[in-house]
Amino acid sequence: MPVKVHGVILMNIEEWEEYRYVEAGIKESITLIEDPGLKKMVEHVCHSGGKRIRPIILLLVSEICSGSYSRSLNAALAVEMMHSASLIHDDLLDQGLVRRNLPSAPEKFGPSGALLCGDYLIAKSIAFISPYGEKVIQDFGKAGMDMAEGEVLDLKLEDESFGENDYFKCIYKKTASLFAISASIGAYTGGAEEELAERFSHFGNALGTAYQIVDDILEFLEVVEGKESKFTSETLPHIYMKSTSKEEALKKSIDCVKLHVAAAKETLETFRECPARDKLFQITDYITVDMLENL
């Protein structure tokens, strides 16, 4: 169904071929799980309404680089499995109760079950990424380590010295790093050389950063739907509020989103014009500025 934010219906990404391709791959991988209890947990986590943005980015980039979806699908599934595992661990750390309008994995299956489900998804992501060669595997592993380091940085949010520079380092590792490798690995699976893959990585980094700041803004304004946690991360508007008014902090945060969106689009403009590139432009707006339209 279409995603609705503040009463406004955004584009229906579920109608996209890339979305259906990823969904079919996830469904097939779940059918291969032998243990019924583990299968139930993975189904709950992986079929809870995610937009599949990261694997879709990977597939679209591979198409821009003249690759094929069949060649790139396992890499896309690896990215989605890693992302799903990170959400479980995030809910464990934040004592998340609700995610995407459903009970979180720890709430539904207990901390031990959720932890094991996350472990399985990480192992499955490694299995999916393993055929793609040394460079791709190294980059994928580095992103996983970055995400863990980002969570460690996030634990320091109660430290009064946690400022803007710490925040951007944290969200690069927690969020933007996976966007960056989704784009760069898509380039590699499409046959691109390292220089082109690096440019796609810059696009993913800028988009992932903008996406996280938008998420922070919505949380700051208490308009996030379908998510509930006992603890929350530090947000950019809250950091700015330490030295300015709420209104100015919000404006500075929105300006920061626009800056990173512009950087992402500027990089996109350098790639060959094609329907896949057009979709990346749509995604860029869809998960950033479109979410802020009615604030």
Curated annotation (Swiss-Prot):
User: How is activity affected by pH?
Assistant: Optimum pH is 7.
The UniProt record gives the binding positions of Mg(2+) 2 as 90, 94
User: Which positions in this protein are listed as binding isopentenyl diphosphate?
Assistant: 51, 54, 83, 100
Q: Give GO BP annotations, semicolon-separated.
A: isoprenoid biosynthetic process
Q: Which EC numbers does the record give?
A: 2.5.1.81
Q: Which NCBIfam families match?
A: GFPS_Meth
Q: Per its record, how is this protein called by name?
A: Geranylfarnesyl diphosphate synthase
